[in-house]
Amino acid sequence: MDASFFIAGRLRFKGRIAMVSIAISYLVIIIAVSVSSGFRQEIRSGLSKLSGDVQLMPPTLNVLDAGHPIDEDASYMPYIREMDDVDAVLPVVYRAGIVKNGEDIHGIIIKGVPRDAGFISDAFPADSVRLPVSIPSRLAEISGLKTGDRMLTYFVGEDIKARQFNVVSVHETMVETDDRLVVYADMEDMQRINGWNPGQVSSIEILLKDNDEEDIVRNAEEAGTLVNAYSSDDDPSVIAVSSVSSYPQLFDWLDLIDFNVLFILVLMTIVAGFNMISGLLIMLFENISTIGLLKSLGMTDKAISKVFLSSSAVLVLKGMAAGNILALVFCFIQNTTHVLRLDPENYFVSYVPVNPDLATILASDVASFVIIMLLLLIPCLFISKVDPAETVRVK
């Protein structure tokens, strides 16, 4: 057994305050990392549901224009579906409308999707309900509409159309991106309202297996290349647009959160490191005679430093474990209860999302542990200044 570790096991590091500080630092670090990951996961998922990761749309970039449909069976679509990262391809029909309920009037966007679309298939009944829609909870709140009500909607164009939709469900909006209220309807109903033939849609949304920003941008470029390469003369003109370019403010905001998390990680690591430095200095002063004795027995400064660094490392690991456990408990409680709420108009989501990614937590733990141990090399310089002749007294 290494003599340094043997001696370290018999030294007592009286650093409860330092250990508490380390535990708090790791608690804050892990929560910050989990919240950042949670925001990114929720907003990506919400945007993917709202408009897909990549959209094929008319060059006008206006999916609400009923005068420029595209073809969901265009000649390039088989190649789009065969892209490696594509998880699903969803044709959709958009139309802006005005909802009137009593004296209340609200502008909405109706998004017609196939009835078998994964996130809406359970909401739409399989029976013969005419013009079923699923409305967002925000619209239900401000208009007073609820499941079972009829929703009178006006469509303004060359001539005004009115339809009585039936509210079959109320869904929670995952991401509040702007003031628009998106109502989900049956795509075939919306095609009839727009006066379109089957196969004509407003846009085609591509959902990816991995919606990381770089993957989204890369797949949008690949989709655009395939469209240009395999379009026929009969296909309407389309362009591929990524959600990153459609909602740059959201991704910029996520990058800002990541920067803040990095700042917190560095700050809390430095705080924990300096608390450990003060604790280690106290330990060195209390054991100055022991240091002198070890030197007189022929132990090198490096070996003696290993003694105290080993003892300090045990304390750091204990604080790390305590902080990690407390952080994971917090994440579990927040994920199950959503006790910490947010204003979605400012934060895009209605509660604090947490996603304790184990790989990220492990990387944060290792990085902060290495930094703290490097900082502890500073007080170890004191060991070289100890003179055995002055510290060891023979009685």
Q: Where are each of the predicted segments found?
A:
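Short cytosolic juxtamembrane segments of multi-pass membrane proteins
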Residues: 381-395
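Peri-transmembrane interface segments
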Residues: 14-16, 215-274, 283-285
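Hydrophobic, regular-secondary-structure patches
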Residues: 31-107
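N-terminal Sec/SRP start-transfer signal
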Residues: 1-29, 40, 45
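Transmembrane alpha-helical interface segments in multi-pass membrane proteins
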Residues: 281-283, 288-334
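A structural signal for hydrophobic secondary-structure junctions
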Residues: 74-199
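Short helix-loop junctions at transmembrane helix boundaries
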Residues: 318-364, 377-381, 385
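A hydrophobic alpha-helix feature that marks transmembrane segments and, especially
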Residues: 33-38, 258-296, 304-307, 379-380
